[in-house]
Amino acid sequence: YSNYLFELLDNKIENFKNHLTIPVINGLSPSSHPTQVLSDVFTVEEIKKKPISKLNICWIGDSNNVLDSLIAASVKFSFQLSIGCPKKFEPSRKVREWVKKNNRKIFIYNDATKAVKGADVIFSDKVISLNDKVNKKKKIEQFKKFKIDKKLMKLSNNAIFLHCLPRGNE
């Protein structure tokens, strides 16, 4: 019995799995990053010594594959998730509609200070996400008020900070 981990596009995975008799898991795709989020959930519980369902989780940053997986984890593990991002970079309408149907513990703020208030854990990622084809300077400027620094961290509930690296533009 074997498991294979592939970093392929979603549609290639779907096609590829039709030719296998063993399980295939999504390690990373443009739409999700479940293995990272599952390992983050384990890390959070190990450090905080509490089930994640008892913690307030915060995401500061762009809506991307990691956030989509964190949203799915929030529904699955029943934890509060506060998302802080500029309005233009909120999760897609499809994701927001799914959240409304599945969870009342996910909140979106266009103000980082409101998003981190009371957070036990703060997640972030690069501002320029996987396969982003954007004006980098402009996007970084749009996230200026969402910089995670000591001042923002002090507004949390003595939060731990998780970032997938490399760092520098979070």
Regions found by a protein language model. Give the residues of each.
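Short, charged/polar "capping" segments at the starts of alpha-helices
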Residues: 2-5, 88-94, 169-170
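Rossmann-like adenosine-cofactor binding region
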Residues: 100-170
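Short, ordered loop/turn segments at secondary-structure junctions
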Residues: 29-30, 86-88, 127, 166
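General beta-strand structural signal in soluble alpha/beta enzymes
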Residues: 24-27, 33, 59, 108, ...
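A short helix->loop->beta-strand "cap" motif at the edges of active sites that frequently abuts
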Residues: 20-22, 79, 154-160
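Phosphate/diphosphate ligand-binding glycine-rich loop within oxidoreductases
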Residues: 1-45, 168
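Glycine-rich phosphate/diphosphate-binding loop of Rossmann-like nucleotide-binding domains
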Residues: 46-125
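Alpha-helical segments flanking ligand/cofactor-binding loops in enzyme cores
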Residues: 7, 71-72, 151
